[in-house]
UniProtKB/Swiss-Prot annotation:
Transmembrane annotation, as ranges: 33-53, 111-131
Main subcellular localisation: membrane
Localization (cell): Membrane
Annotated protein name in UniProt: Putative uncharacterized protein YDR053W
Record's bilayer topology term: Multi-pass membrane protein
GO cellular component: membrane
Signal peptide (UniProt feature, chain positions): 1-19
Keywords (A to Z) from UniProt: Membrane, Signal, Transmembrane, Transmembrane helix
Record organism: Saccharomyces cerevisiae (strain ATCC 204508 / S288c)
Organism lineage string: Eukaryota, Fungi, Dikarya, Ascomycota, Saccharomycotina
């Protein structure tokens, strides 16, 4: 079930467009040191993933290209499927945590909520969620 939800999200990000006609782009996550991987970072990452899975449609836009993150040997698809299959998020194996840091450890810049639209700015990436 979780794998199916993520595949739907991946198709949204890479191949679809939302009801407002905005083409969905890919995301870019900047690698950060292991020491910054904290419980609040995990909570924020999981919250953003929860938004992806519960919204009607989503859009991610970044000023940098990230094609390799989706199709490389350490692709987003494979890593996130691994993460979503683990029950206890605070006891992830070290290797999985190391691989996930560039993908899930965010520095939240600002959040804007307007009716059914939530906009989150994370570094150079902007996330749009329509409910």
């Amino acid at each position: 079930m979780r794998e199916s939800l993520f595949i739907i999200f991946f198709q949204f990000v890479c191949h679809s467009s939302n009801s407002l006609g905005v083409t969905l782009g890919s995301t870019f996550f900047r690698p950060v040191p292991l020491l910054t991987w904290t419980a609040p970072s995990i909570d924020l990452a999981l919250s953003i993933l929860a938004l992806f899975f519960s919204c009607k449609c989503c859009c991610c836009w970044s000023s940098r290209r990230s094609r390799d993150l989706f199709f490389g040997k350490d692709s987003v698809v494979l890593l996130l499927l691994q993460l979503l299959s683990l029950e206890n998020t605070f006891k992830w194996p070290a290797a999985v945590v190391d691989a996930a840091i560039p993908l899930l450890c965010f520095k939240l810049v600002s959040v804007s909520f307007n009716g059914d639209l939530i906009i989150i700015f994370v570094g150079e990436t902007i996330f749009f969620f329509l409910f």
